[in-house]
Amino acid sequence: MNPNYLDFEQPIADLEAKIQELHTASMGPSINVDTEVRALENKLRLRTAQIFRNLSAWQISQLARHPRRPYTLDYISVVCDEFQELAGDRALADDKAIVGGLARIGHRPVMLIGHQKGRDNKERLMRNFGMPKPEGYRKALRLMKLAERFGLPLLTFIDTMGAWPGIDAEERNQSEAIATNLIEMAELKIPVICTVIGEGGSGGALAIGIGDRTLMLEYSTYSVITPEGCASILWKDAAKASDAAEQLNLTARRLKEFGLIDKVIREPIGGAHRNPQQMANRLKAVLLNELEALDKVPLVTLLNQRHKRLRTYGAYENH
């Protein structure tokens, strides 16, 4: 099976392969396959729509990790008209799992911070598979405070399995770095918009995820643990990940129903990886609209609303 396709995408892969074969055949003399190609392309559109209309939570979890899914830097290249990356935590190192810097979206200057995974093995190792160490979160905090100093709105793109759990991270106080970010983000005197673009995993996601608006792409996830991790703990069997995904209620649609996020941003048919340009344009439009709306909110009201949001997380009623 093509590694760029998930198992449930195999019918799509087969149709695309047939279309490619016909295109190759049409390069020969006196061969016209336009009618057949159009028929297959129509079938492809219908089959793709059918598959993506009925996705399970586990399938959405797989899409959130799709190897071709756009990452933070991919979105930055389209969403931002200008971007100047800033590096380092000014204490130890520059964690490549977190990228951030000054940006301009349209006429709007902003600070943008996000998790960054890698495309190939070399980059995955350099980016630590998108799992930040304490210095990554301290770099993020440095940029947040810089944004506050200059009155720049803060945008964060969330896409991580979680914070790095290695001994080196624990030695440098990973939990303190995450906790400090949570405290500081709750009090930032600037508008903050957080967008889950892929995986939103546990405290590693929350450490750049406290804000005035929380958005999720349609096929992203947000959870306290991965489905595999949950299955290993509850059932001692990672193969039950699909059951765990359902129980975790980690999809954008379910989280919107619970009131834990503010907006679900629709993805192109087949997912963001099938049309990254279109997805980035949609994201840009939504971010500009949200920034404009937050411009009208007085700072005191903004902070009060942010604190109220945080206090409602985890609240429930007995029936």
Curated annotation (Swiss-Prot):
The gene is accA. Acetyl-CoA carboxylase is a heterohexamer composed of biotin carboxyl carrier protein (AccB), biotin carboxylase (AccC) and two subunits each of ACCase subunit alpha (AccA) and ACCase subunit beta (AccD). Keywords: ATP-binding, Cytoplasm, Fatty acid biosynthesis, Fatty acid metabolism, Lipid biosynthesis, Lipid metabolism, Nucleotide-binding, Transferase. Pathway: Lipid metabolism; malonyl-CoA biosynthesis; malonyl-CoA from acetyl-CoA: step 1/1. It is found in: Cytoplasm. Belongs to the AccA family. One of its GO terms (cellular component) is acetyl-CoA carboxylase complex. It catalyses: N(6)-carboxybiotinyl-L-lysyl-[protein] + acetyl-CoA = N(6)-biotinyl-L-lysyl-[protein] + malonyl-CoA. It comes from the Bacteria. GO terms for molecular function: acetyl-CoA carboxylase activity; ATP binding; carboxyl- or carbamoyltransferase activity. It is an enzyme of class 2 (transferase). One of its GO terms (biological process) is fatty acid biosynthetic process. This is Acetyl-coenzyme A carboxylase carboxyl transferase subunit alpha. Residues 32-293 form the CoA carboxyltransferase C-terminal domain. Component of the acetyl coenzyme A carboxylase (ACC) complex. First, biotin carboxylase catalyzes the carboxylation of biotin on its carrier protein (BCCP) and then the CO(2) group is transferred by the carboxyltransferase to acetyl-CoA to form malonyl-CoA. InterPro entries: Acetyl_CoA_COase_a_su (IPR001095), ClpP/crotonase-like_dom_sf (IPR029045), COA_CT_C (IPR011763). Its EC number is 2.1.3.15. Pfam families: ACCA. Coiled coil: none annotated.
